[in-house]
Curated annotation (Swiss-Prot):
Protein name as catalogued: Urease accessory protein UreD
A GO CC term attached to the entry: cytoplasm
Family: Belongs to the UreD family.
Species per Swiss-Prot/TrEMBL record: Synechococcus sp. (strain CC9311)
Superkingdom: Bacteria
Any one GO MF annotation of this record: nickel cation binding
Gene: ureD
Length: 296
């Protein structure tokens, strides 16, 4: 039976650059909990986030607010896959179901670098979930996100049913002439879109990777980078496409394998590090079933 007292977990974090690398200040409220931070390559603060309740039901909310001060570096990930449980028809008070929501907001200062790489989201049958990602960064800031959603527990022959997944991504640049849109990406997938030929054509895994680069990419460089990313699709199953943004790139995955989605996105992650002459990323200790060492 659906709880009558939905959660509203919050996480407010500020990252600052220090002599020994980037550090964080702030904290979380239940059901969110911070795990032990580690120092990664280039002084990056690697911080896993745990959802102690095990998943979200209708009415639950998560609010994550991130601030990166000048020259700070952060990798924020999650300890496990996020589960969204069915809502429609589970409550006599709300028979049509209620939405679970997640809001992530990030403000980046000069020469800062944020990698937002949560583990996959699993949407159960009849679940309603809306996620919003809002990022503001300077011209020399870098932001990378990769999010994967599995629409229905396919191993149990489950589909979305009457459920629905919504996503709204907004990325803006601060320029000398004001704010400039880098990306506005709004998506909604219901069971019709999941099954439809002009939708996902019954492919239950969908993912998006976005990189807002810290510098303009010349035409030759971005074309070579996209060619390398397309080559990285070898031996992976699914439909994988990528393209350029005004100052960065976007990649999409649709298919049947969340593992292959993770592999491809992780290879792209390594490419973005390489493009900035940074050390190749190492797999966070909380990630399972991951390709190692990372290509390239």
């Amino acid at each position: 039976m659906q709880r009558l007292d939905p959660w509203h977990g919050t996480c407010n974090l500020q990252f600052v650059a220090g002599s020994s690398g980037s550090q964080f200040q702030g904290g979380c409220t239940a059901p969110l909990k911070l795990m032990r931070a580690e120092r990664g390559e280039n002084g990056r603060c690697e911080l896993p986030l745990l959802h102690t309740a095990g998943g979200l039901v209708g009415g639950d909310q998560l609010s994550i607010n991130l601030g990166l001060r000048p020259n700070s570096r952060c990798l924020l990930t999650s300890v496990a896959a996020q589960k969204i449980y069915g809502s429609i028809g589970r409550s006599q008070l709300h028979p049509l179901g209620t939405w679970a929501r997640q809001q992530v907001s990030a403000e980046l200062d000069a020469d800062s670098d944020l990698e937002w790489l949560p583990q996959e989201l699993v949407l159960y049958a009849d679940a309603l979930f809306e996620q919003n990602l809002s990022v503001t960064l300077p011209m020399d800031g870098s932001f990378l996100s990769a999010e994967i959603v599995r629409l229905g527990r396919t191993a149990a022959n489950e589909t979305l049913g009457q459920g629905c997944w919504r996503s709204d991504v907004q990325i803006q640049r601060q320029t000398s002439e004001g704010r400039r849109w880098e990306l506005v990406d709004r998506l909604e997938i219901s069971d019709d879109a999941l099954k439809g030929f002009h939708g996902l054509n019954q492919q239950p895994v969908f993912g998006t990777l976005v990189w807002a680069a810290p510098f303009p990419l010349q035409t030759t460089k971005i074309n070579n980078l996209l060619d390398d990313i397309r080559q990285d699709r070898k031996a992976l199953e699914g439909q994988m496409h990528c393209g350029a943004l005004p100052q960065g790139l976007i990649a999409r995955y649709s298919g049947f394998s969340s593992r292959d989605a993770r592999f491809w996105f992780s290879r792209i992650w390594a490419r973005t590090r390489q493009a900035r002459n940074l050390a190749s990323p190492k797999i966070p200790r909380v990630w399972p079933l991951q390709e190692y060492p990372l290509r390239p």
